[in-house]
C-alpha cells in the first residue's frame, strides 16, 4: 500500500493484518491491541493511509471520509484532522460461521462490484463498504441458517421481544455465501 491513497481505496484487514500494516508505519501495535480497541486502530489506519478501512471481525467497523468531505477547503478552515469529518459505520450482522477460509475474498468481490457501480464524484466509500459488509454477513446468516450476530440487542424489561434463544446454524464455506448472494439481494429489495 502506498504511503497515502484516496478515500475511495478500501482496505479490508482483519486484526492481524491491520496490526501488520500499522507496525510497518511505525505504530507499536499487535493483533490483540487491535481486537481490544478496534475503533481506535481503524481510525488510526485511516488517518495514516487516507484509505477507507473495513476492519473485519465479530463486529465489522468501517471508517472513512464521507463523500461530501472537501479536504482542501477543510484544511484551509483548520478541520483537516477533525474527527467529525470521519464517517464510522458498524455492522454486526454476521454469524461466527463466516470466519472461514475465502470469506474475505467473497467480501472483497462484493465490495468491488458495489464500488464499480458508483459515480466517481458521489461515491461514499464508507457507506458502500458498510453495505457490502452487511450484505456479506446477511448472506452468511442465510447460508448457515443462523441467527447469531456480533452483538445482541439489549433485552428490555417487560418486552415480549426477547433474544434469549438464537439458532446457531451450521458451518459454511465461502461458496455457500456466494450461493446466497442473489437470494439475499432479492429479499432485501422486496
Give the residues covered by each predicted segment.
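Glycine-rich phosphate/dinucleotide-binding loop and adjoining beta-alpha-beta core of small-molecule
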Residues: 1-92, 186
Amino acid at each position: 500500500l502506498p504511503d497515502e491513497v484516496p478515500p475511495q481505496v478500501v482496505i479490508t484487514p482483519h486484526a492481524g493484518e491491520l496490526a501488520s500494516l500499522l507496525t510497518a508505519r511505525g505504530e507499536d501495535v499487535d493483533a490483540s491491541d487491535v481486537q481490544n480497541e478496534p475503533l481506535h486502530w481503524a481510525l488510526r489506519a485511516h488517518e495514516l493511509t487516507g484509505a477507507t478501512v473495513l476492519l473485519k471481525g465479530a463486529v465489522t467497523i468501517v471508517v472513512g471520509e464521507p463523500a461530501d468531505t472537501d479536504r482542501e477547503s477543510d484544511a484551509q478552515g483548520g478541520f483537516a484532522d477533525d474527527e467529525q469529518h470521519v464517517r464510522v459505520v458498524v455492522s454486526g450482522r454476521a454469524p461466527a460461521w463466516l470466519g472461514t477460509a475465502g470469506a474475505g475474498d467473497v467480501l472483497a468481490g462484493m465490495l468491488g462490484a458495489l464500488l464499480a457501480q458508483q459515480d466517481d464524484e458521489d461515491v461514499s466509500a464508507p457507506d458502500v463498504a458498510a453495505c457490502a459488509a452487511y450484505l456479506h454477513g446477511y448472506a452468511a446468516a442465510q447460508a448457515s441458517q443462523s441467527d447469531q450476530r456480533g452483538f445482541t440487542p439489549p433485552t428490555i424489561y417487560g418486552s415480549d421481544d426477547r433474544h434469549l434463544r438464537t439458532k446457531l446454524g451450521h458451518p459454511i464455506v465461502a461458496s455457500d455465501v456466494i450461493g446466497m448472494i442473489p437470494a439475499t439481494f432479492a429479499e432485501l429489495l422486496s
